[in-house]
Amino acid sequence: MNNQGRSILAWATLFIFVILLFNVFQSDSLLGGRNNITFSDFLTRVDEKTVNSVKIQGRVIEGTSNDGSTFNTYAPDYPDLVNRLTSNDVNIEVVPLETRMNTFLGFLISWFPMLLLIGVWVFFMRQMHGGGKAMGFGKSKARLLSDKGPKITFKDVAGIDEAKEELTEIVDFLRDPSKFQKLGGKIPKGCLLIGPPGTGKTLLAKAIAGEANVPFFSISGSDFVEMFVGVGASRVRDMFEQGKRNAPCIIFIDEIDAVGRHRGIGMGGGNDEREQTLNQMLVEMDGFEANEGVVIIAATNRPDVLDRALLRPGRFDRQIAVANPDINGREQILKVHLKKIKYNSTVLARIIARGTPGFSGAELANLVNEAALIAARLGKKEVDMHDMEEAKDKVLMGVARRSIAMSEKEKRLTAYHEGGHALVGLYCPAASPIHKATIIPRGNALGMVQRLPETDEYSQNREQMESSIAVYMAGRVAEEIIFGRNKVTSGASSDIKGATNIARAMVTKAGLSDLIGPIFHGSSGDDMYGRQPNNETSEATAELIDAEVKRIITQGYEFAKDILTKHIDQLHTLANALIEYETLSGQQIKNLLSGRALDSEEENKFPFNDSSTIKIDKEKSPEKTKTTKAKKENYAS
């Protein structure tokens, strides 16, 4: 029987016991179980000499009639009762009140509260620690992975080849240690997987468990610390003892930052239970006693908060970065997940990978699942590319809110706002290509223009950052040109925030301001408490930084205004098309502005050679370097 069944059975038994006990009291109560009559009726029967005998206990009278029937009644304070009974020849028996209750029942009543408390305590201890281990607080909660169920191998892991290679070496060592030992090599004692959420750290651990033919224990960092002092350290000792008994083996600790944070930051100056647990883990991983054959693999997305003693070689010999996949990695991941659904030939993993820069493996898996759900909702037998595009838009831009009743005025304003973003994006020399423009409300935005880089970008140059600022400001500029300064709305608030962040990064981090120079200003990140450290920038320098940020944003604003003023006719054309069609792809926008059919697939090198504006020539424009993070740029109204 499983734990849930035992729990239900225990509660049912307790409930039945209480009911039976209640019935005992009821059946044996002072007035229960017999024919109750009034005291007046009782006196009448006595006077009529129909009562043979009575048993008096306190004020309760149990009587027997001449015909053998029994009855109960309750007597008030009636001093002449005994005289009246004897005068009518009634046999009287008096029973002391305390002897009415039998010995067992009295014992049960006196000890029942204590027995109930003990029973509840034992029950909860069994639930917390399983099968009778009421005193097993210090036992490790590490679970030995079973061979039953689906097995995950390295074939199921894609897009993180470097991490796979490092971990494959550990698996090979466990399988055939002589291959490495003949050259004097030793198995790594520990391996730390570092990366943002959703990149596949836990999936890699599952693949190791599937590949290595050795015992595999898994535990969460939060499983060590309990409300009782010393339990965490005891569980660490027990976990390593299990590992030694099953060596060679692998122990996987997920979210190790829950127990491995910096020491010495306990609040109140008291002895921190988590700190004791960490100290025990440090000793077990690399102390006086050898741990041959026990490999520790841990995962975290917060390596900055881990104690330095935990990260040193000898404990975690390897730190493997599991980053978001590049375009090739995303394509491989998509192919793995596409195998699990039914799709037709229109679905191209490469195109989807290009349109999802910065996506983690978990996000790509969610995208494929969303596409399958959309196709099922529409009654399709297979997933097609349209479903994938709709799922991508849903993940990137939010759920389409077609139920919103927008007035014609709001719809027209949104169309010009998004048209301004798109048009300036086409004319900026270093802006990423326009992927889609829409005035269908999604998420918290009334409309959106999505730009996607042709390749993954890991850094940006000055021209790219200035172009991004101009595109951000273009929506507000379009509103001002078409509707006037007094009609500008708050819809550009998120655009202004994005432009300000880029401009401030140019000045304080990238050193792209001639006035401030190549000097880093601001904090380098949160401290161990998650707070921003004190800023060491002087007030005078802070004023200069603010002035430079304003200058850069104003420059981008004027640049966008110049483009939209010179190409006002194209802005009108694009806005009217958005009002009519609601959503336009980047190719459709180029076709529209170049006078071609909207769905023409001919190569279109828009914009044209126009001396009145900036000519976009990809071959002559400065070579694009790569951005710190593959970006998904959405410009919301």
From Swiss-Prot:
Keywords: ATP-binding, Cell inner membrane, Cell membrane, Hydrolase, Membrane, Metal-binding, Metalloprotease, Nucleotide-binding, Protease, Transmembrane, Transmembrane helix, Zinc. GO terms for biological process: protein catabolic process; proteolysis. Residues 28-103 are periplasmic. It is found in: Cell inner membrane. It is a multi-pass membrane protein. The active site is at E418. This is ATP-dependent zinc metalloprotease FtsH. It comes from Rickettsia conorii (strain ATCC VR-613 / Malish 7). The gene is ftsH.
